[in-house]
Each structure stands twice: as structure tokens, then as C-alpha cells.
């Protein structure tokens, strides 16, 4: 059986340091079932190809709201590269003329500072908040840390192919 799925919507594909998403301006477009849409558009063989789908929406608590869906359709809380592209999108497409904006995400409201040159955003700085270092909140297998009585895996010694390394497990919210 051949699966047929037709979707007509305007979108923009953007990337921040290679982390690419399909962006939809939900001030103009409606996206029903964003989890399924994310899976379809993210497919690099039969879709547009991306790390996921980001919806740019109106917000009652901030200047904008960002809803992010991963390529597997799961909803993410936050993506630093993705939110920087949201800032560029809303400024460059005329949704705001502010050079500091607030964007509501599933991990809270983020404040972004936009550096503008010749009417276009050249750089975006975002306060991502405090990093998560507790292994069970990242998540990461915590057996070794628990056995050693550690609450965090910071500068933890490991061996990879016989070579010694130190690792720190950290999450910024997705």
C-alpha cells in the first residue's frame, strides 16, 4: 500500500550551526496535528528534511511563542539554535521591530537580544537559563554516579577505546 499524505502550507527552512528546522508562521498558517507534520516534513528522503518543526505563534505572556517538535514527532521543550532562528524570522519578516524579544517555550520564557545590520538580524544572543546537571533529569544512566555517591556527572573520568577522557553530562532543556 502506498501512503499518501498531502499537506499545503507555507514554511521557511532555517538552520543555526547546521541544526535545521522547518518554521511555520502560525500568525498566518494553521497546523493541525503538528506531531505528524513534524515526522513528515523532517524525513530527509521523502520530506523536506530537518531536525524537526517549529511553530511561531502568538503569545499572551511574551512577544511570541515557540512550539518545537522533534523529527520523531515528540514535543521538545527548547532548542537554542531553533530559538535563535525564531528571532531572526520574526524580525526579518516584519513581525516585530524590537531588538530584544521574549519568547515563550515549554521550558519558560527566554529573552533574546538581536544584533541588526542593514535591516537584517546578523546575530542573536539568548539566555538559555541554568544548565541541568542532575543525571536523572538529563536523562543519563546514573549507576556509576550513584555507586560513587555523586549527584552530578561533572568532569567524570571515562575510558574510550583505552584512552582516558573526562565528561560532563548537561542538558539545556530538550
Task: List each model region and its residues.
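ATP-dependent small-molecule kinase catalytic core of the GHMP/sugar-kinase superfamily
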Residues: 95, 105-174
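A glycine-rich beta-to-alpha transition motif near the start of alpha/beta enzyme domains, typified by
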Residues: 2-120, 159
